[in-house]
């Protein structure tokens, strides 16, 4: 995961100081890309420990089309707590847009189901896209989508995925996003009887919050460890039937966790 450390270093060296919605302040760069070969290990950051339970359960929660944090809390995941209302609701965030994007005529579109079907029937399509950026519902969301759009690509019976992340909290958020979309790529590949190829992460406003700079510098002193591998223990009937127990990250070694405050 030296690729990720290079992004940290790039922001520390080249970033410009900017104000932000949270009032914390950031060092920011615009436009950055990282590529991860999924055949050479699963891209979990090793220079600090990641909470893989949160990564898996959050993705399963998205896939359910859920927008209430009750499922997350039942499974010991707190990463969305700060944005939920008193009832645990977040408004029409990721899961809603992925699974039931509303249309003008009162119907909904299950973007993910459609994309999986397209990959199976027309793998050369250039329209294998899922978007969470629904302009008509942004004002109803507790947090507008940071990872806004992703696209699949099939070549030589191998599946790749590229994510566009308009706003990237590089210290806290991006390691989760890399792992989450890499996991999704593995799951979709299994459902479509494909092998995996690459996950490509493309960031817009890539930033380190000013109260994360020391933590980023600590992380840069650590030597990356070998990447783990992912085992998916069964192939369920659909993309939406996976369970937490279906996934195992083999040989995940990491340096200790590094605590940092979240900007709300």
Swiss-Prot record:
* Pathway, per record: Pyrimidine metabolism; dTTP biosynthesis
Q: How does it assemble?
A: Homodimer.
Q: What is its main location?
A: cytoplasm
Name it: Thymidylate synthase
The family this protein is said to belong to: Belongs to the thymidylate synthase family. Bacterial-type ThyA subfamily.
SUPFAM superfamilies, alphabetized: Thymidylate synthase/dCMP hydroxymethylase
Q: Which GO terms describe its cellular component?
A: cytosol
The superkingdom listed in its UniProt entry is Bacteria
